[in-house]
Amino acid sequence: MADSVEGSVAKLRFDISMSLDGYVAGPDQSIDEPLGVGGRQLHEWAYGLSTWRASHGQEGGKTGVDNAAVRESLENIGATIMGRGMFGPGHGAWGEEPWEGWWGGEPPFGTPVFVLTHHPRETLVKGKTSFEFVTDGIHPALERASEAAGGADVAQQYLAAGLVDEMQIHLIPVFLGGGARLFDGAGLEGIGLERRRVVDSPTGVVHLHFRTAGERGR
């Protein structure tokens, strides 16, 4: 989930890769398998792209429609919202040596990141990225992200609450057979969507871009 800026208006959009059977992570997520069993397949299409590599401090890489989709995903982002499951493994209290993210000393975000959790924790700064841990719900997290801008359950909550402006789904030609579904549960019925764009890639990935119908209420 990211708060992007267009002109002077902050917009909330989510961008995610999804399997043909609707999963955004494989089963049995763990420290050894942070994306779940088979979940890495959802993101392999992006790893060799020039925009992805540049965001991780690397040179070279491929261009084309997939790269354009990643570039659009990363443009004009002022802040990011994620669930605890995207930040790291486990639940409950953080412990004496709390997890500091999957990304090492230089996370690729370069902007404030707001992590939804039930357990308080001091703000963590890694490189150019700050992680603030929000314990009072999705609306306060959105307010903080919007001010700063000037995972599946999180996307569902914001979408069901009518707070999402746009979404881009990268449909990957694989079946995972289990894991975390993007759209799972009640509360999404009746949400209007306007198709903005559908882009077919030679790699087999289909990039779907939608706007939600109507004005978002804060």
Task: Please give the residue ranges for each predicted region.
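Enzymes that bind and transform nitrogen-containing heteroaromatic metabolites
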Residues: 2-218
